[in-house]
Structures are given as structure tokens and as C-alpha cells.
Amino acid sequence: MKVSPRRRARECAVQALYSWYVSQNSVEEVELSFVTDQDMNGVDLPYFRKLLRGTVLYVEAIDNDLRPFLDRAEDEVDPIERTILRLSAYELKYELDVPYKVVINEGIEVAKVFGSDDSHKYINGILDKLAPALGRK
């Protein structure tokens, strides 16, 4: 099955956000390095940039929104899961043209690609609680 340009943008954004989180480099450095070094064919590049920059810009607000729904301390959440949650929370809160069910489904699908065996269930549970808290259900 062909992956949509937006799905590819989300997958690339998760990878770039993870790199930003681990490396502590600026979002500009991470973005430049990522688009230079990775195959960006089939990626909605403007949406990738919007997701990456928006998530980093609003990361504190996003973490505050997510915190009540986590079942453990933030630093105990798997870094990949945390990255997917941040990206999905950004989309839920700031990309209002994307239906909330699409955001949740995309978070689940990206978790199936990058997360551990049960990551998609964890992501689904949190996003399902977060969406109504953000007025998206």
C-alpha cells in the first residue's frame, strides 16, 4: 500500500523530533541535517517543516497538555512514544483542519512503525483522552 505524503511527513517529523530531543541541537540544525541526509521523496515537505517547527515551538504547552494523561513520570515514558505523543498533541491542538480521528489514527500507525510492540495501544489510550480535553471530540 502506498503511504500518503502526509504520513511520510509525520514519520519523518517523528524521526527529526527524536533527533532534536536526543541531540539537543537547534530545530534549524536538525531540519537541515534531516532534509540533507534523508530520502524526502514522497514527503509533504511543507507539512513536515510545520510539524517539526510547531512541535518544538509549543513543546512546553504540549507537555503540559499531555502530563495529566500519562501513567508515569515524563522521563519514564519511552522517548519514541513521547515524541509521537508530542507530534500528535501538536496536531490535535494547532492543526484544526485535520480531523481528530485522523490525528489519532496517524499517531497509532506511526507508533506501529517506530514504537515497541504495544506502543500503539499506549498512544491510542492517551490521545483518546487528550482529544476531548482539547475540545476536539
From Swiss-Prot:
A Pfam family recorded for this sequence: NusB
Protein purpose: Involved in transcription antitermination. Required for transcription of ribosomal RNA (rRNA) genes. Binds specifically to the boxA antiterminator sequence of the ribosomal RNA (rrn) operons.
Gene3D superfamilies cross-referenced by the UniProt entry: NusB-like
GO process terms (BP): DNA-templated transcription termination; transcription antitermination
Similarity field: Belongs to the NusB family.
GO MF term set: RNA binding
CDD domains, A to Z: Terminator_NusB (cd00619)
Alphabetically ordered keywords of this record: RNA-binding, Transcription, Transcription antitermination, Transcription regulation
The protein's name: Transcription antitermination protein NusB
Organism: Actinobacillus pleuropneumoniae serotype 5b (strain L20)
GO CC term (a single one): cytosol
